[in-house]
Amino acid sequence: MDRTTARPNRRAVLATGVGAALAATAAAAGPAHAAPGRGARVEGRLRALERTHDARLGAFAYDTGTGRTVAYRADERFPIASMFKTIAVAAVLRDLDRDGEVLARRVHYTADYVKRSGYSPVTGLPENVANGMTVAELCEATLTRSDNTAANLLLRDLGGPTAVTRFCRSVGDHVTRLDRWEPELNSAEPGRVTDTTSPRAIGRTYGRLILGDLLAAHDRERLTRWMLDNRTSDERFRKGLPADWLLADKTGGGDYGTNNDAGVAWPPGRPPVVLAVQTTRFTPDAEADNVLVAEAARLLAEAMTD
């Protein structure tokens, strides 16, 4: 990678996202695989990483410029955890909002609702419980802070968790599904099919949302801006990817050490790369392993740029 190339500019990324629409469409249709030798080497390193960290690891990466793909357990199901939140916000933007009217609507909720939803660093603030929040503010809290109450309120407006599944089916994702609310959806028992996705499925869907034409241009820009401002991945993708890559992503975590990250990254002077890493472990109280996610991201980045 050319270290002298300037870091990608946020404004340029937001303005030209649709320029990668053809690449995103190619990813959805089934991208080319990496060269056999290179792909085997990367998969071997991911397998070794999985063994070292005593976890099950799934990974998917797609270079929208070259078509190069890395896939490891990419079609196996893993708990989706909070990665559903990107799709919920996209569904609000596509299916509910009209000319900003829905985004401007103020939603009121109770302290008990916050308590039942679990992790709620924004909606749980006393001033927000007292005054409510606009739908736009709920979307922002959902994506930048992974706020559970905000996500549940969006799901309520959409008609419940299965609205995420319906959205995915409508855009050709036949794997990703959501069945329960926060925080129950994070139980992550081995073998569970409900509330799951695969690295390839979530990677493709995220890529098409951020780079393609699934959303109107102004909605795609909103979604991407919120994901660029994500504050939950400092020890995951942001730790593993080169510091000069621009990243729009969403994390997720749950029981059984479930720990995920997925999004789109812009290397300097190169087309964007779609990335997804999902991990889970073998006991209900297992610790989430941020180092595993960060190291997997590092390996994927190296594979995309070597």
UniProtKB/Swiss-Prot annotation:
Active site per database record: 82 (acyl-ester intermediate)
Keywords: Antibiotic resistance, Hydrolase, Signal
Molecular-function GO term, any one: beta-lactamase activity
Signal peptide per UniProt: 1-34
One Gene Ontology term from the biological process aspect of the record: response to antibiotic
Reaction(s) catalysed by this chain's protein: a beta-lactam + H2O = a substituted beta-amino acid
Post-translational modification: Predicted to be exported by the Tat system. The position of the signal peptide cleavage has not been experimentally proven.
EC number of this enzyme: 3.5.2.6
Family: Belongs to the class-A beta-lactamase family.
Additional comment: The class A beta-lactamase family has a specific amino-acid numbering system, sometimes called Ambler or ABL numbering and often misspelt as Amber. A multiple sequence alignment was used to derive a consensus sequence and then the consensus was numbered taking into account insertions and deletions. This allows use of identical numbers, e.g. for active site residues, despite differences in protein length. UniProt always uses natural numbering of residues, hence there appear to be differences in numbering between this entry and some papers.
Record protein name field: Beta-lactamase
Gene, per the UniProt record: blaF
